[in-house]
Amino acid sequence: MSVFYPIHCTDYLRSAEMTEVIMNTQSMDEIGLSPRKDSYQIFPDPSDFERCCKLKDRLPSIVVEPTEGDVESGELRWPPEEFVVDEDKEGTCDQTKKENEQ
């Protein structure tokens, strides 16, 4: 003999409520765009362009001063002088090892 106990599932109730909301909402055809200025626009408003240009004139400029490591021509030196010195030292170490082996 089986006994059936009704199980109250809150997830089922939530899905039923969502179905009701979906069925009672307006379709996209019924929703009209409002003529407000902040509605979606593909092209910018010309008055916004003029306002932007006025603000653009007020923006501060960024000045970057050269540091000691910068080259005056603007070119980067690669490898840096520090690495070149280290490589020379490694080269002399390798030569010394070869001479010791012979």
Swiss-Prot record:
Transcriptional activator. Disulfide bonds: none annotated. The gene is lbh. GO terms for biological process: positive regulation of DNA-templated transcription. InterPro entries: LBH, LBH_dom, LBH_dom_prot. This is Protein LBH. It is found in: Nucleus; Cytoplasm. It comes from Xenopus laevis (African clawed frog). Keywords: Cytoplasm, Nucleus, Transcription, Transcription regulation.
